[in-house]
Structure formats: C-alpha cells, structure tokens
Amino acid sequence: MQESHFFAHLARMKLIQRWPLMRSISSENISEHSLQVAFVAHALAVIKNKKFGGTLNPERIALLAMYHDTSEVLTGDLPTPIKYFNPEIAKEYKKIEAAAERRLLDMLPEELRDDFRPFLISNTADPDESAIVKQADAICAYLKCLEELSAGNHEYAQAKKRLDVTLRERHSEEMAYFLQTFAPSFELTLDEIS
C-alpha cells in the first residue's frame, strides 16, 4: 500500500489565512471558513427544500462546501481584488485552481479517487449544488464583514459594498430567507444574542 499525503495537505488548511490584505480584528483561516460555508450551504439547501420546493441533498452540499477551498493548500488564498482584477487574470487563475484540484485528487489512492472527484474537482459538481455553495461562500464573506464592521473595523466597509452587489447577483429565495432570518444576529454582541 502506497503512502498518501492528501490529508496532511488538508490539515494545512488551518495555516492559510483569509483576507490577507485586510486588517482584521479576528483572523480567519480556510479551515474555519470551509466549516462555516458547510453550515450555511447545508442550511440553504434545507431552506430551499422546505420553503421553496427544492429537491437538493443538503448533506452532499455540506460536503461540497467542506472541500470547496481545498485547492488553496497548494495555491494559497489569492485576494478577490487580485483574482478578478481583469478577465485574463481570472481565467488563468481558474487554470491554476484546476491544476491544484487535479494534483490533490492524484494524491489519493487510485481506489478512492472516484469517490472524492465530485468534491475536489469543481467542474464536475452538479450546477444547482455548486450554486448553493457559491451562495453560501458569498454569505459567509458578507457575515465576516458584518462582524468586523460591528466591532468598529471600517477596513471592511468597501468589501461589504462589493459583497452587497455579489449577493444581489446571486439572489435566490433561500438566500433572502437566510439573510433576513440569521444575518442580523452577526451585528449583535454576545450579551444581545444570549
């Protein structure tokens, strides 16, 4: 049996900091972020199914969300303003991400690859499931902005404005429900939510 470094690489997710160009009151790594995205994606899928006639698999979507940023253990977290500075950079970075995803998949023993492929290779996921994960990813970035702004960190004001646009572009009924029901609490203190 051949040794695999796959999970040793995933364990390094905790070392990759998000928001690297921003002064943050509370730091966040991609391991923490992926767990929060999994929570939110799962909730969005449940909300869509219960309230808006969806037929999604919330557990599968939570797994997709857990793995959605794993390629960053090889690429690092490129800040959004750089990643999307122009279409050429965005296109080339997508190629880098795809190569990193394939490299991670290739680290697994051959007999496990088919089971992990849908979670590691982003272009193999079902478009409806991917859309929920993308929505959750944007919501989590938005919630981070709310937390930082409510703690007095105005460094996140511009990021929040950019995310307001992103959330409008990705709008869905389940997102609106989630944001109306859960987001306001992120601007409150511990005493206020207790």
UniProtKB/Swiss-Prot annotation:
Enzyme Commission number: 3.1.3.89
GO cellular component: cytoplasm
GO function terms (MF aspect): 5'-deoxynucleotidase activity; metal ion binding; nucleotide binding
Matching SMART domains: HDc
Essential cofactor(s): a divalent metal cation
Cross-referenced InterPro entries: HD/PDEase_dom, HD_domain, YfbR, YfbR/HDDC2
Location(s), subcellular: Cytoplasm
Binding site for a divalent metal cation: 33, 68-69, 137
Site annotation Appears to be important in orienting the phosphate for catalysis: residues: 18
Binding annotation for substrate: 18-19, 33, 69, 77-80, 137
Biological role: Catalyzes the strictly specific dephosphorylation of 2'-deoxyribonucleoside 5'-monophosphates.
Family according to the record: Belongs to the 5DNU family.
SUBUNIT field: Homodimer.
Name by which UniProt lists this protein: 5'-deoxynucleotidase VC_1978
Species annotation: Vibrio cholerae serotype O1 (strain ATCC 39315 / El Tor Inaba N16961)
